[in-house]
A protein has these predicted regions:
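A transmembrane-helix-recognition feature enriched in membrane-embedded lipid enzymes
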Residues: 1-52, 110-115
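A cross-family acyltransferase "interaction/gating" segment
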Residues: 107-110, 124, 157-231, 238-239, ...
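A short, well-structured juxtamembrane/interface segment
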Residues: 34-72, 135
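Soluble extracytoplasmic domains of inner/organellar membrane proteins
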Residues: 128, 134-136, 140-145, 151-167
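Membrane-embedded segments
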Residues: 80-139, 143
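Generic beta-sheet signal
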Residues: 71-77, 99, 120, 143-149, 180-182
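Intrinsically disordered, low-complexity terminal tails and inter-domain linkers enriched
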Residues: 56-70, 257-283
């Protein structure tokens, strides 16, 4: 195991200890300050440089992701890797929506559970409705909630249609919907080193990242999609996907996933081939 691997293990264990011992006593804003700093350190340990663009928030709000008195904001992001979560956290700490299977991931599953991830329980008939209620409550508190709207990962060279199920609480709350584009590169060229796709094991993905050279992740906050008037969740999902595709310089998604079942909600979509021929995997 390279030195980075040892440091990463120690960092994750420290994060679990902090979240378990301290978080129950802290307000969400203070938790998020710790999450942001911890995530930035994780990226540094992994040798991943973070670059952000377009974040239109004052530093005090960007540091916590919480804006009391506001209607909150929903981030709709493309998805390449498990490390996407920490890249977004390092830029703007958010409460993520994820499939319940993430709980079983070694160490990382416990960590993301302790920091307040909202899970969708697969196999439950009313899973999406239950999650939507919790998302609505968090938005009403002025929090930032993040969703990987493709419901699965790609290698970053394509974009899949966005699910719209989890947009319902944002529209109901009157929250802003922000498209967020993530792109990995090395020496100025698009890189697939961070991609977590197909049947790849988490350990393999981790090794690829730790041994990559000059890996950079860009997190771009794009122009919010209007949610007023007669714009429904389907319209917002398509508009967000198109803005991300344009920024990534990839073709816009083909087809639609507007009527997916509960098991196709965020992080529970079935696998689909991406443009490069690799098989996407269900998302965190």
């Amino acid at each position: 195991m390279p030195l980075r691997g040892v440091l990463l293990l120690a960092h994750v264990l420290a994060g679990i200890a902090i979240a378990a011992a301290i978080f129950p006593w802290l307000a969400q804003r203070n938790r998020n300050r710790i999450i942001r700093a911890w995530s930035g350190w994780l990226l540094s340990i992994c040798g991943v440089r973070l670059r952000t663009a377009g974040l239109p928030l004052p530093p005090a709000i960007a540091a916590t992701g919480v804006e009391p008195g506001s209607r909150g904001r929903l981030l709709l992001a493309n998805h390449v890797s498990w490390i996407d979560v920490f890249a977004i956290h390092a830029a703007l700490p958010s409460r993520f929506v994820a499939k319940s299977e993430i709980r079983s991931w070694p160490l990382l599953g416990l960590l993301v559970t302790l920091v307040g991830t909202l899970y969708i329980e697969r196999g439950r008939r009313h899973a999406v409705a239950s999650t939507n209620r919790r998302v609505f409550d968090r938005l009403q508190c002025g929090e930032t909630v993040a969703v990987f709207a493709e419901g699965t990962t790609t290698d970053g060279r394509s974009l899949l249609p966005f699910h719209s199920n989890l947009l319902a609480p944002a529209l109901e709350a009157g929250a802003e919907c922000w498209p967020v584009a993530l792109r990995y590169s090395a020496d100025g060229l698009r890189s697939t080193a961070a991609a977590f796709v197909g049947e790849m094991a988490l350990a393999t993905s981790l090794w690829n990242i730790l041994t990559a050279r000059r890996l950079q992740v860009e997190v771009a906050f794009l122009e919010p999609v209007p949610t007023t008037g007669d714009r429904g969740r389907h319209h917002v999902a398509v508009a967000a996907a198109e803005r991300i595709a344009d920024w990534l310089d990839v073709p816009p998604p083909r087809g639609r996933r507007f009527n997916g079942s509960a098991n196709q909600g965020a992080g529970t979509a079935d696998s689909a081939p991406d443009a490069a021929g690799a098989t996407a995997r269900p998302a965190p």
